[in-house]
Amino acid sequence: EGEHPRRSWLVKNRRLVHFLMLFSGGFSLYIFFDFSVITQLVIILLGILCFLYPFTLRRIPFIKIVVIALVWSTTTMLLFTLENNIIISVNEILHLVARFFFVFAITIPFDIKDLEYDTKNIITIPLFFGIRRSKLIASFLLFISIFIAVFQYNTSSLILAHLLALILLYFIALVFVWKSDEKKKEMYFAFWGEGLSICAYLFLVISLLIF
């Protein structure tokens, strides 16, 4: 097995990586003390989870993708809710679940790409279920997210512009999932996979301008 291209890049650019880690860590610590206590506690718990992953948690099958989806969805939605003292209602829970499923789904293609590297180290969904079934799992989660968005719209918890932006995002995510395979170049995953988060914001802005 060859060395993972992302690992090779990190090794070659380790000084830059270390500098960015120190800078972002220092800045994060600076703003950490401006948050409320409950927000700080959640951040600490997420930090402990991320810290334990490479030492003990990674031995648990499928835990990597769960940790990624949990940390991403929590930091981009739940922390904002807690910090602004927004009451966590059914609507907020549904939104968090939909975001968790979305992140979970778009992370599966990265595990497909890493199949040859993860074989000896970690049990992932594509390794256990195969590529096609993994894509079906991702599709199922994305369709659940669409269902949640439609449900929220029907209960007046979501405006039309938000609904259309989310549906477009989820369908593009579906295309990304089904076009993914282990032979795709690294740039495909870096551009489309990582870029979906930016697309979510762009779709929302465009949808609000139109509707």
Predicted segments, located by residue:
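Solvent-exposed interhelical
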Residues: 1-22, 100-143
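Membrane-interface helix-boundary motifs at transmembrane edges
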Residues: 2-10, 33-36, 57-60, 86-90, ...
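Intramembrane alpha-helical segments
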Residues: 9-83, 176-179
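Helix-coil boundary and interhelical linker segments in multi-pass alpha-helical membrane proteins
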Residues: 27-41, 76-97, 148-161, 205-211
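Hydrophobic core segments of alpha-helical transmembrane domains in multi-pass membrane proteins
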Residues: 39-50, 94-101, 162-170
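Functional transmembrane core segments of multi-pass inner-membrane proteins
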Residues: 65-116, 136
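Glycine/small-residue-rich hydrophobic helix-like segments
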Residues: 125-174
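Extended hydrophobic alpha-helices typical of membrane-associated regions
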Residues: 163-211
